[in-house]
């Protein structure tokens, strides 16, 4: 039986590339993002893709997406909890409170919503269990200047990962985190345009790393994986 994966933020970047590669090797993939059109393009009419438009800030939308996957394919094996945004850079006393709130809503609460919906399904399905992969960042280790919003959320994701890894053990739910340093995506291209670091790697290298984590049996888990552009000068540039 083909395994199933829900990917949030699946319309572009790492999410889209992971979806394409997963379907190419036999995964059934739920594609979740706000914009339907790019999801339809990625799905391209495939029976192994399910287009699930929605916003990660809406818990009901994610619960509905998980329920739709379970109704069609019987279960959810993996959540790639991927959706996220960059906020405008600045010192803490220059940051617009709306940008802080939006960062927390998408990068932290959105991932909480995804994990909550997936955990509930994995806990009750038969056979029980599954895997949650949270997309962190090198910013989960050390920040780049002016990144108080983004860095704060990514440090919080590390706490989410550790707690889910512990709480999931009785139910065969594994949780790990991938911390990616500058895969070439629209988000990173925008960062470069604003004067950020030019050291990047192909987005496919990040997607292959996600699939390595997803492919493991539930008796094994990559708790934390860091994959980064080789020429990044130091980890603090994540």
Per-segment meaning from a language model:
Residues 90-92, 99-101:
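Substrate-binding pocket helix/loop in short-chain dehydrogenase/reductase
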Residues 173, 177-178, 193-235:
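C-terminal helical subdomain
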């Amino acid at each position: 039986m083909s395994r199933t994966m829900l990917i949030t933020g699946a319309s572009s970047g790492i999410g889209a590339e992971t979806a394409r590669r997963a379907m190419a090797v036999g995964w059934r993939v739920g594609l979740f993002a706000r914009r339907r059109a790019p999801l339809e393009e990625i799905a391209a009419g495939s029976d192994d893709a399910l287009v699930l438009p929605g916003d990660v800030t809406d818990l009901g939308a994610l619960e509905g997406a998980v329920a739709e996957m379970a109704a069609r394919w019987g279960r959810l094996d993996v959540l790639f909890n991927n959706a996220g945004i960059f906020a405008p850079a600045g010192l803490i006393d220059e940051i617009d409170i709306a940008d802080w709130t939006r960062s927390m809503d998408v990068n932290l609460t959105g991932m909480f919503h995804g994990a909550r919906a997936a955990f509930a399904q994995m806990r009750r399905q038969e056979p029980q269990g599954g895997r949650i992969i949270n997309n962190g960042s090198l910013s989960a280790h050390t920040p780049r200047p002016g990144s108080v919003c983004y860095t704060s959320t990514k440090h919080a994701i590390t706490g989410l990962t550790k707690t889910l890894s512990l709480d999931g053990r009785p139910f065969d739910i594994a949780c790990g985190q991938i911390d990616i340093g500058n895969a070439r995506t629209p988000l990173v291209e925008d960062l470069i345009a604003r004067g950020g670091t030019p050291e990047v790697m192909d987005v496919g290298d990040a997607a292959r790393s996600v699939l390595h984590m997803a492919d493991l049996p539930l008796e094994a888990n990559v708790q934390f994986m860091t994959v980064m552009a080789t020429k990044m000068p130091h980890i603090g540039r994540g």
